[in-house]
């Protein structure tokens, strides 16, 4: 699956609400901040068919050189792209979440640069944890 433009979280409004009162958990070296967004309430300019709006951040304070930050961003983005299909299937097959959209912000929390394999393990663990949290809310 491709990582398309309509999957990217670009709305500063949604990003600020994410950091004010969203759910979050860590899977070292990553931290996921997520929030459920009602698709109907979004302005037309932000609406997309994608069930997940995705953004990521690598801290400038930890990685001074832009080259290092860009390498980590590429690794995270590629790992997410390779693993998102399982997550999309879960959301599209569940009637409760057919009209919902989720905003994801992935923060890199590691102090050193990790390889793609280690980042991929973190993304897989993160997706697994998110699925468990969703299933827990479905049962309620």
How should each PLM-predicted stretch be described?
Residues 1-140:
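Positively charged, solvent-exposed patches that mediate nucleic-acid binding
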